[in-house]
Structures are given as structure tokens and as C-alpha cells.
Swiss-Prot record:
Catalytic activity: 3-phosphoshikimate + phosphoenolpyruvate = 5-O-(1-carboxyvinyl)-3-phosphoshikimate + phosphate
EC numbers: 2.5.1.19
GO molecular function: 3-phosphoshikimate 1-carboxyvinyltransferase activity
Pfam families: EPSP_synthase
Function: Catalyzes the transfer of the enolpyruvyl moiety of phosphoenolpyruvate (PEP) to the 5-hydroxyl of shikimate-3-phosphate (S3P) to produce enolpyruvyl shikimate-3-phosphate and inorganic phosphate.
Complexes and interactors: Monomer.
Active-site residues, Swiss-Prot/TrEMBL: D313 (proton acceptor)
Organism: Geobacillus kaustophilus (strain HTA426)
Protein name: 3-phosphoshikimate 1-carboxyvinyltransferase
Pathway: Metabolic intermediate biosynthesis; chorismate biosynthesis; chorismate from D-erythrose 4-phosphate and phosphoenolpyruvate: step 6/7
Chain sites annotated for binding phosphoenolpyruvate: K20, G92, R120, Q167, R344, R388
UniProt-listed PROSITE patterns: EPSP_SYNTHASE_1, EPSP_SYNTHASE_2
Amino acid sequence: MQLPTNVSSLRGMIEVPGDKSISHRAVMLGALASGRTVIDHFLPGADCLSTIDCFRKLGVDIRQDGTTVVVEGAGPGGLREPAAVLDVGNSGTTARLLLGILAGQPFHACLVGDESIAKRPMGRVTKPLREMGARIDGREGGNYTPLSIRGGALRPLRYTSPVASAQVKSAILLAGLFADGVTSVAEPHRSRDHTERMVRLFGGEVNVDGLTVSVAGPQRLRGTHIYVPGDISSAAFFLVAGAIVPNSEITLKNVGLNPTRTGIIDVLTQMGADIAIDNVRNEETEPVGDITVRTSTLRAVEIGGDLIPRLIDEIPIIALLATQAEGTTVIKDASELKVKETNRIHTVVTELKKLGADIEATDDGMMIRGKTPLYADGIVVDSHGDHRIGMMLAVAACIAKGTVRLERSEAVAVSYPAFFADLRSLL
């Protein structure tokens, strides 16, 4: 795909698609609940459609019409042993959270995914689930897909996670809904808390004490209505575009502002971006608002520690942002980037260097020196099949002089099928 380059301005208003994390969880909890769940502003991206497909194979009646999904909950003991393998596609969230749910089911299931999923570590989830009593086998001792799982009666678990990962935490908590007793997860830093908020929305009970989250099982959930706010991880690409493309002003409507996810706003503010948030309100369990960003003069910052879990998915676009900030930006404590859809430390550095960025990889992040003009004399960049790399490169092309072609542009459909159309609407 040929990308727009040397863009003179980006102006307009868009509504980014529904939050991917919340869309996944809404389907999963709706499937476990008794009664009907209606999901509005659902993200119909490839990852979330994989979640729907898996739960249909587990016997759940799910109807989708665009961004509206109706789930007829199976209720306690209502999931059925699948006749076919459960294919999670490219979705790590589907894989890990589904394992937590399957751990509590008295039947056998096989879980597979695409080439990218086959490289992503599952041991961080299979290990604690085995401690709870699930029988899980797979490649390299159950650390990689394909995985075979036979669930059943689970023991409660008090688990200290070595990583701040919402997927690990959520898998254990979901399994804990089926265990007889209190299951808890303690994290080194606070990860996104959508699971905790949504279990409560579905009538469940969750206790949060500092960095420890616990559920007392077994629990019964009830169907509900949920509006999925705009995904701040998708909004991040346009927030950065608005800050670095000349003469720009972009407003993003109805964006989720969950404080465990707003690290990108903190970084933009620290860098000196002209950014404003209006119309803040609560939509069921999540804060939502409208964000406006304008072209800004930016300064370098250091990013690490507790901030990393709040912006881990935004680091590729933050790296681009840093190329346009005066000084040296350091991103550290971000080793989790190595086990995303790609090794994002490597892919970000490789692709931005093609465009002339002064960027280098470190063991747990990267260093970016700015402000650096980007150029593209017939350059070909590659998403590496990673949706966030593809969208970052499309924004990078906007400030590059010359011509840029993006390979594997279809990857963006994982989380933002209309991304290129929305970008064109701002030109």
C-alpha cells in the first residue's frame, strides 16, 4: 500500500472503534453469565471475531450485526465440549483468557492460533492454571500453542505474578470464578483493570487491595448491557499524528479514559503537547471523554517503571513521537515488548531507521534522539504482520518527505479495520 507522505495538515473529528480489551471481555463474561448480554460499539476486528468464533464452538449463541453483539449466556455449567479446535487467530488475549475459563470446565479442548501466536509464551498462564488443577499439555511443556486442556474442579490459588500483565491476571481471576475459595493475584505494578470492573458489572464480586486482586468462587454472573468506549490504544495513533503533523487539529470522540490505560496522555502532556480532554463522563464502568490535540513543540522524556503497563501497547507510536521531540527520549523497563505480536523493540527500531530516525535498541527498550526529519526516497516499510507497527508507520509516513510503501498493511484489521479510511478523512 502506498502511504500519504509530506502531509501539510490533519484536521477533523473521528470516533475510533470500540476498545479491544473490553470487547473481548464482554463476549467472554456474557457467555459465562445467565441471561442475555447486549454489547454496543463492539470492535469487529479480527481478534475480537476470533473470540466470538471460539465461544460459538463452545455452544454459546452469539449474534453480531456490525458493532452490536447479542450474547445468550450459557450460565453455570452451560459451556459445551467443542467438536473442533478453538482457533484464536492472532489474539493473545483470546488465548490466555480463554485458557482461564477452560480450566474450570469439565471437558477437553484444543487451542491453536496463527504463526505469531505460536511464538508467544503461554507458560506464564499455563503454570498457575496447572497449580489450580487444570491439565494442560502443549509444545515445550505447554509454553507454546497448540495446547490441549482438560479442566474441572479447581483449587483456589494465591499467585504472585512476576510480570504486570492483565492477561495473566485475568486468566487466573476467570479461573478463580470456578474455584471453591479465594483466588488472588499480586502484581509488581498495576496492569489494566477492565476484568475487575466488568466482573462487577456482570454482578460478580472482586476485591482490590493495592496491587493484589482477588475473587471468591464459585460465582454466578448475570447478563447485562455494555457500551464499549473508544479504544485509547487506537486513538493513540491520531493523538500522535495531531501533535507532529504541521498545522493539525484532531478531535477524538468517546475515548475510554480508564486510568490504567492513559499513559499515552501522560507522556504527551510531559512532552509539552497541546492536548485537551472534554465531556468526561462515566459509561457504565468506564470513564469516557473527547480528546483534542494540536500540532505541538515537543521535548524528550524518560519513560519507565509504573508507567510502562499503562502504555505498553502505545510504545511503537510513542517511539515515533520521540523522533520529533528535542533531546534524547529513553524508554526502559519494557521487556514485555519482545513477546508481543512481534518483538516490538526490534521491529520499531528496524522500521523507523529506514525512515532516518536516530533510534537504537536497548535490552529493555530503546533510545531516540530528536528532533529528526524523516525521509522516504521510495522506501518500503513492513508491518511484520503487527497491527500496531503498521499504523505507526502510516503516521510516520505523514511527516516523511518522498514516497513510502507499506507491506502487509492488512495487519491493521486486527484492531482497527477502518484505520486508513479514518486517516484519509483527516487529510
